[in-house]
């Protein structure tokens, strides 16, 4: 019936099969395909009309091809090369009936095909139930239900009914059990629910114990076996194409099992060539992949050992609003590995990528997660410019899922030279799908990405990269920053030395020569009017503005994560714990911390880490109940302050890299309220000479 040893574009007319098998039904769409045969599939696609049948009419079916129907041309990207011998065959009910008569059988009537196709419902339905209408795979079909008892049902499904060509050949040869497959076979039946449970244990077996001496590759209608099979649970391997939200096993012959009453015209083209060599079936070609095996993208140049299926939605499925007939094209190869590779370079364009997916049911209530391999491939696709808008939309579904919000999944915003999988995930979503703040409800990542982008041009040390890694923490943490306060004197007395443009939300460390500095004594420090007016009780969080509370929340979380990474305890003094009583809950911290109207600060507060060490006698600020240099929000800063040319502001993150052995250079923090510089190492105050 179907030619062997040659490339074959097998077109299956699903419209004809649907209307003949299910009386009154109209074909609408194809939800899935089950391939159960010893063949290799090259491509699957749909056509609006039937292609021209180029096979030998007399040898194949004895029926001339009707030329009055509209024909379609196979797309250029899916055509075989002209120097490759191939045929195009069209299968419909008319040709099947003619083949039956030619090989001496009786023509298959619709009632018989209806009975065999729907035999699976008999085991679950009471045989006494003789309704005028019965349910065939979810659709109501006119006519009495098929008469099927359990014994005949088991006997029929044990061989998963052969078609005429294979049935005729097999009747001439002894049916002895062999350990190899000497031919090809494609099942034209949906496995009924009752039998599918029994067959599930044998799905992953590789050896096929039932002999198939078939000269052809049948994809025909079911027929009862002439003799019972030696193995009742035939080891059948199913390759499944997932397409729409409802998954079901579908045969190439078009026995659509879902909405048969709403089905639109389509025909399926199957390109298949049988394998000649006897031996074990290649489980990577046909067998379902094991559940722990991940899906993989297969490139044309290195995919010669895998039977891959182009399952992209735009090529496999009709759009919901399309009412045109379509074809499904399955190709199969018989060549050896070397010939396959040579032919693949001819027949498969370089820009066609395929994705092979293992059979599984659709997840309920869960979104899909991505493995790092798939994430890295998305980056390659972006460079290839081969991602369509539809693909990007599906990737958007991936990144909107739960995987980016797991508590222990660290999402890092750094762009270091070595990026882990979680960094890759975030960077990919940023480059493909917009800014990272839209990817997760943890909106404080927005500030992390802004900081990472702002310091990328100045970044010269690995420590800077490390400190830009802001990771998610699902627990509220203790505050490691001192309580900020409003600095009223900053706005009244602008300093000519330090201007506000270089003072983001924190004090920038300045490397100054010690010869240009003069230490301020304790008496002099206490005599400064701004310092004497300060009382920390006036600046508790209850009197803070919302923006200051937000900065404290972010700073506290930041410091806690940095110290957690280092594995050290916070070692706060009692005064710092008392002063930092900003209560932050997990829920409020997640979504309402940052408002888009506030510009996120650049790397705020990272230099405070030195002050978070356990209190020591060399740091009197811990014992004197004094606070660190205040956090000045951008709205509170004087607008006209700028640094003098006499001081050089070091790049943040190089603070530890400054020459601390040389006592002539000090790394100081400027305190605008006290109008002096503070040395976090010694706790001393300095002013410019």
Swiss-Prot record:
Stretch list, region Disordered: 143-179, 217-236, 241-262, 333-424, 583-660
Superkingdom of origin: Eukaryota
Compositionally biased residues, Polar residues: 150-176, 343-359, 411-421
Matching InterPro entries: CFA20/CFAP20DC, CFA20_dom
Biased segments, Acidic residues type: 394-405
Compositional bias of kind Low complexity: 583-593
Name of the protein: Protein CFAP20DC
Species, as recorded: Macaca fascicularis (Crab-eating macaque)
Protein encoded by which gene: CFAP20DC
């Amino acid at each position: 019936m179907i030619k062997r040893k040659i490339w074959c574009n097998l077109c299956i007319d699903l419209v004809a099969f649907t209307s003949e098998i299910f009386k009154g039904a109209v074909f609408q769409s194809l939800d899935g395909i089950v391939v159960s045969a010893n063949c290799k599939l090259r491509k699957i696609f749909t056509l609006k009309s039937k292609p021209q049948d180029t096979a030998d009419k007399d040898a194949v079916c004895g029926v001339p091809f009707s030329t009055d129907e509209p024909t379609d041309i196979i797309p250029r990207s899916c055509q075989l090369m002209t120097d490759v011998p191939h045929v195009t065959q069209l299968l419909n009910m008319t040709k099947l009936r003619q083949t039956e008569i030619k090989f001496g059988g009786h023509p298959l009537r619709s009632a018989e095909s209806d009975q065999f196709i729907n035999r699976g419902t008999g085991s679950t339905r009471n045989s006494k139930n003789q309704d005028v209408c019965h349910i065939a795979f979810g659709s109501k079909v006119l006519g009495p239900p098929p008469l099927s008892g359990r014994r005949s049902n088991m006997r029929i499904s044990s061989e998963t009914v052969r078609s005429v060509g294979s049935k005729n050949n097999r009747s001439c040869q002894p049916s002895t059990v062999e350990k190899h497959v000497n031919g090809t076979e494609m099942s034209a039946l949906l496995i009924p629910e009752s039998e599918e449970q029994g067959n599930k244990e044998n799905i992953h077996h590789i050896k096929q114990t039932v002999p198939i001496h078939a000269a052809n590759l049948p994809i025909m209608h079911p027929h009862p076996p002439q003799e019972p099979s030696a193995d009742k649970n035939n080891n059948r391997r199913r390759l499944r194409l997932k397409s729409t939200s409802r998954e079901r096993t579908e045969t190439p012959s078009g026995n659509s099992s879902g909405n048969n009453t709403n089905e639109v015209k389509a025909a399926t083209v199957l390109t298949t060539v049988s394998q000649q060599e006897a031996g074990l079936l290649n489980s990577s070609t046909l067998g379902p992949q094991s559940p722990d095996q991940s899906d993989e993208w297969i490139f044309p140049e290195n995919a010669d050992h895998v039977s891959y299926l182009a399952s992209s939605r735009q090529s496999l499925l009709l759009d919901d609003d399309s009412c045109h007939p379509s074809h499904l094209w399955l190709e199969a190869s018989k060549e050896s590995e070397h010939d396959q590779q040579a032919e693949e370079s001819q027949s498969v364009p370089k820009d066609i990528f395929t994705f092979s997916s293992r059979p599984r049911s659709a997840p309920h209530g869960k979104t899909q997660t991505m493995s790092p391999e798939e994430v890295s491939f998305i980056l390659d696709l972006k460079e290839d410019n081969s991602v369509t808008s539809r693909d990007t939309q599906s990737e958007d579904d991936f990144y909107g899922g739960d995987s980016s919000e797991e508590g222990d999944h660290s999402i890092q915003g750094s762009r270091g030279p070595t990026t882990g999988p979680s960094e890759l995930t975030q960077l990919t979503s940023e480059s493909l799908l917009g800014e990272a703040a839209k990817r997760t409800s943890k909106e404080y990542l927005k500030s992390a990405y802004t900081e990472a982008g702002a310091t990328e041009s100045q970044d010269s040390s690995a420590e800077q990269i490390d400190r830009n890694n802001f990771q998610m923490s699902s627990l509220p943490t203790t505050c490691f920053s001192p309580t900020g306060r409003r600095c009223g004197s900053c706005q009244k007395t602008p300093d000519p030395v330090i201007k506000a443009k270089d003072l983001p939300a924190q004090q920038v460390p300045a490397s100054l020569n010690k010869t240009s500095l003069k230490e301020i004594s304790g008496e002099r420090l206490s005599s400064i009017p701004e310092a004497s007016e300060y009382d920390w009780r006036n600046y508790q969080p209850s009197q803070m503005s919302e923006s200051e509370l937000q900065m404290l929340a972010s700073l506290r979380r930041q410091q806690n994560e940095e110290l957690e990474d280092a594995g050290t305890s916070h070692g706060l003094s009692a005064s710092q714990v008392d002063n930092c009583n900003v209560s932050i809950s997990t829920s409020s911290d997640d979504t309402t911390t940052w408002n888009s109207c506030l510009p996120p600060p650049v790397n705020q507060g990272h230099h405070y880490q030195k002050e978070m060490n356990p209190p020591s006698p060399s740091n009197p600020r811990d014992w004197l109940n004094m606070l660190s240099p205040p956090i000045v929000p951008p709205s509170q800063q004087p607008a006209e302050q700028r640094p003098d040319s006499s001081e050089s502001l070091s790049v943040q993150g190089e603070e530890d890299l400054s020459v601390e052995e040389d006592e002539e250079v000090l790394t100081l923090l400027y305190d605008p309220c006290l109008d002096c510089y503070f040395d976090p190492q010694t706790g001393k105050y300095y002013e410019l000479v």
